[in-house]
């Protein structure tokens, strides 16, 4: 059987080690990617209504079925997104 093997997408591509270089920890990577994936999902939801409140994918999508989280991870790996780390802790609740 000859041919090409499909390139796996999602958490295996881009590699997790490359993604971790963009953030301080794996936990901040999860938050970072999840927030962007929600923005992409909202963009697609609003696309049919003509409301373009959110920015669409910044990388070329391989198919219409590609999941927003996979798109977000590829955007992070490409260096197309920036994030700010909040260093001030919240005040204690009294």
Swiss-Prot record:
Top-level EC class: transferase
Cellular component GO terms held in the UniProt record: DNA-directed RNA polymerase complex
Catalytic reactions of this protein: RNA(n) + a ribonucleoside 5'-triphosphate = RNA(n+1) + diphosphate
A single GO BP: DNA-templated transcription
Matches recorded under InterPro entries: DNA-dir_RNA_pol_omega, Pol_omega/Rpo6/RPB6, RPB6/omega-like_sf
Kinase listed as a keyword: no
Source taxon at top rank: Bacteria
Keyword Transcription: yes
A Pfam family per the record: RNA_pol_Rpb6
GO molecular function annotation: DNA binding; DNA-directed RNA polymerase activity
EC numbers on record: 2.7.7.6
Keywords attached to this entry: DNA-directed RNA polymerase, Nucleotidyltransferase, Transcription, Transferase
Function: Promotes RNA polymerase assembly. Latches the N- and C-terminal regions of the beta' subunit thereby facilitating its interaction with the beta and alpha subunits.
Subunit structure and binding partners: The RNAP catalytic core consists of 2 alpha, 1 beta, 1 beta' and 1 omega subunit. When a sigma factor is associated with the core the holoenzyme is formed, which can initiate transcription.
NCBIfam families given in the database record: rpoZ (TIGR00690)
Family: Belongs to the RNA polymerase subunit omega family.
Protein name, entry field: DNA-directed RNA polymerase subunit omega
Primary gene name: rpoZ
């Amino acid at each position: 059987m000859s041919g090409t093997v499909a390139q796996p997408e999602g958490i295996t591509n881009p590699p997790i080690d490359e993604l971790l270089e963009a953030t301080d920890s794996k936990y901040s990577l999860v938050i970072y990617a999840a927030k962007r994936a929600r923005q992409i999902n909202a963009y697609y939801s609003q696309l049919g209504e003509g409301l373009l409140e959110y920015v669409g994918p910044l990388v070329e999508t391989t198919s219409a079925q590609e999941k927003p989280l996979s798109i977000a991870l590829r955007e992070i790996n490409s260096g197309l997104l920036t994030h700010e780390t909040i260093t001030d802790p919240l005040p204690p609740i009294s």
